[in-house]
């Protein structure tokens, strides 16, 4: 399913209420006494020097304005890491270079991120008009340049690193990000009414994560993410994260925790996550946890609730033996795991993709997402792969109403979620027909 009309996006956004803060309030605009308008060359030159100049001169207590309907060429990376109490009014449209070789040269020289924004109380405000406020990255050409059985060409930039606190991000819009849309780090951040459109008309858009999140008190709501990787990926150390009233799809990899434990020496620490009232369309995954064999740490108190899925291959998926088709790992302790505790999956409804399961990210045989799964039927409502009989504790499922498109009974794959540690699991942990207890 492809996003082809901005009117459709506008309709979806207009159907949800405005979101409020995530626990902190950004500073009053009255304290931002300086208004700085970014001038545009109107397409005749590179506007990066002007943008960098304005960010440098107006780094504190300012409103930085990209004018509505105006185009800006951002042909060089922008780095503004000393911001404080700044509102970025993104009412224009930013255009990245369409010269793939030029961008790869910049990335290979050591600059991996196109926009780097850091500082407390850095707000981003786009316009309600869905035709403006876009960052246009022209990723389609990059995706189409990927060779057969490749997983994305080298030299792809991350679009944005956004590190802040006590901030709001409203009406952020990203069109065809090349890869890795936004790395969002910090505390007390509210994101609302964002659009990330990484749907492809050709080759698969590898690594087009929408939001990679790390921090405390972060809320993402009322947004649309169509992409070829995680809509949200929560990393360590993260606490009190909310993802609600969103629509995600295309060939999304869903609402994910991790991956965790790739570095066996790092202790993963994640608590209090809630994913609620989310629609998932044509995705590979809906709710997903992924950690590597040999990892260590604890993820505790996680809920996915009121999740509607349409044509999703794996609606509920847990693996403590995550596999990356581009990475080889040897010498890890196979009995070590990132521990999972107090996980709830509640009120799931909709259809399991039985007819055309999987997605375009398959570059190996077997596909990375099928590796290690016995006798897949693509009727599975749940896949629960615990690494040991002690690594999953207090798992709960309630009101799981998922049906395969072939209209057979839903099935389950479950490994080592023991009844002793999971008395309210809601079904028998075995491989076969899914039957609620």
Swiss-Prot record:
Enzyme nomenclature, EC number: 3.2.1.67
Reaction(s) catalysed (UniProt annotation): [(1->4)-alpha-D-galacturonosyl](n) + H2O = alpha-D-galacturonate + [(1->4)-alpha-D-galacturonosyl](n-1)
Glycosylation sites: 25, 42, 82, 99, 149, 269, 301, 311, 428, 431
Keyword Cell wall biogenesis/degradation: yes
PbH1 repeats: 215-236, 238-259, 270-291, 299-320
GO cellular component: extracellular region
UniProtKB keywords: Cell wall biogenesis/degradation, Disulfide bond, Glycoprotein, Glycosidase, Hydrolase, Repeat, Secreted, Signal
Subcellular location: Secreted
Cystine bridges: 386-392
Keyword check for Secreted: yes
Biological process per Gene Ontology, one example term: cell wall organization
SUPFAM superfamilies documented for this protein: Pectin lyase-like
InterPro entries: Glyco_hydro_28 (IPR000743), Pectin_lyas_fold (IPR012334), Pectin_lyase_fold/virulence (IPR011050)
GO molecular function: galacturan 1,4-alpha-galacturonidase activity; polygalacturonase activity
Signal peptide feature range: 1-21
Reported function: Specific in hydrolyzing the terminal glycosidic bond of polygalacturonic acid and oligogalacturonates.
Protein name (Swiss-Prot/TrEMBL): Probable exopolygalacturonase C
Species of origin: Aspergillus oryzae (strain ATCC 42149 / RIB 40) (Yellow koji mold)
Taxonomic placement: Eukaryota, Fungi, Dikarya, Ascomycota, Pezizomycotina
């Amino acid at each position: 399913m492809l996003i082809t009309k901005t009117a459709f996006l506008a309709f979806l956004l207009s159907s949800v209420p405005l979101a409020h803060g995530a626990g902190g309030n950004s500073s009053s605009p009255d304290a931002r006494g300086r208004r700085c308008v970014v001038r545009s060359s109107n397409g005749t030159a590179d506007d990066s020097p002007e943008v960098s100049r304005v960010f440098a001169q107006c780094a504190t207590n300012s409103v930085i304005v990209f004018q509505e309907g105006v185009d800006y060429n951002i042909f060089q990376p922008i780095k503004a890491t000393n911001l404080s109490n700044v509102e970025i009014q993104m009412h224009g449209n930013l255009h990245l270079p369409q010269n793939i070789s030029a961008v790869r040269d910049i990335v290979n020289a050591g600059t991996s991120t196109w926009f780097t924004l850091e500082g407390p109380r850095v707000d981003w405000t786009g316009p309600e008009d869905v035709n403006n406020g876009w960052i246009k990255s022209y990723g389609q050409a990059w995706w189409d340049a990927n060779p057969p059985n490749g997983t994305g060409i080298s030299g792809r930039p991350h679009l944005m690193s956004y590190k802040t606190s006590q901030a709001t991000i409203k009406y952020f819009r990203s069109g065809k990000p090349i890869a890795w849309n936004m790395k969002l780090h910090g505390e007390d951040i509210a994101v609302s009414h964002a659009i990330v459109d990484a749907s492809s008309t050709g080759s698969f858009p590898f690594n087009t994560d929408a939001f990679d999140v790390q921090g405390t008190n972060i809320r993402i709501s009322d947004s649309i993410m169509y992409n070829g990787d995680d809509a949200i990926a929560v990393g360590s150390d993260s606490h009190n994260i909310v993802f609600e009233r969103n629509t995600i799809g295309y060939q999304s990899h869903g609402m994910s925790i991790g991956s965790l434990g790739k570095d066996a020496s790092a202790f993963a620490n994640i608590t209090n996550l809630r994913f609620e009232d989310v629609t998932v369309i044509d995705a590979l995954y809906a709710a997903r946890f992924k950690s590597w064999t040999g990892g260590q740490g604890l993820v505790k108190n996680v809920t996915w609730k009121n999740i509607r899925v349409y044509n999703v291959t794996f609606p509920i998926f847990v693996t403590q033996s995550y596999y990356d088709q581009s990475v080889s790992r040897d010498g890890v302790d196979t009995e070590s795991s990132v521990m999972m505790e107090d996980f709830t999956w509640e009120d799931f409804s909709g259809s399991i993709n039985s007819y055309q399961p999987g997605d375009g990210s398959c570059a190996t045989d077997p596909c990375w997402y099928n590796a290690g799964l016995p006798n897949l039927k693509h009727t599975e409502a749940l896949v629960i792969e615990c690494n040991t009989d002690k690594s999953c504790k207090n798992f709960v499922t309630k009101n799981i109403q998922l049906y395969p498109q072939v209209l057979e009974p839903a099935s389950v794959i479950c490994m080592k979620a023991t009844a002793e540690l999971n008395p309210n699991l809601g079904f028998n942990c075995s491989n076969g027909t899914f039957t609620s207890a």
